[in-house]
Amino acid sequence: MRCLPVFVILLLLTASGPSVDAKVHLKTKGDGPLSSFRDNAKSTLQRLQDKSTCCGYRMCVPCG
């Protein structure tokens, strides 16, 4: 029975404490946006396609 007032006081202190902004997000090194990853993949594929032009229908062979 002695624990009940302590529990109530702690509950009131917790509820009246300063609010924390839940949307604060600290970015780390690996938290880049997914769109930049897609852009990098597209540019890499475009660069590889520009370096070797496909001459055949079934096999992609670099032309001279």
From Swiss-Prot:
One Gene Ontology molecular-function label: toxin activity
Keyword entries, A-Z: Amidation, Disulfide bond, Neurotoxin, Secreted, Signal, Toxin
The organism's place on the tree of life at top rank: Eukaryota
Signal peptide: 1-22
Family statement: Belongs to the conotoxin T superfamily.
UniProt free text on domains: The cysteine framework is I (CC-C-C). Alpha4/2 pattern.
Protein name in the entry: Chi-conotoxin PnID
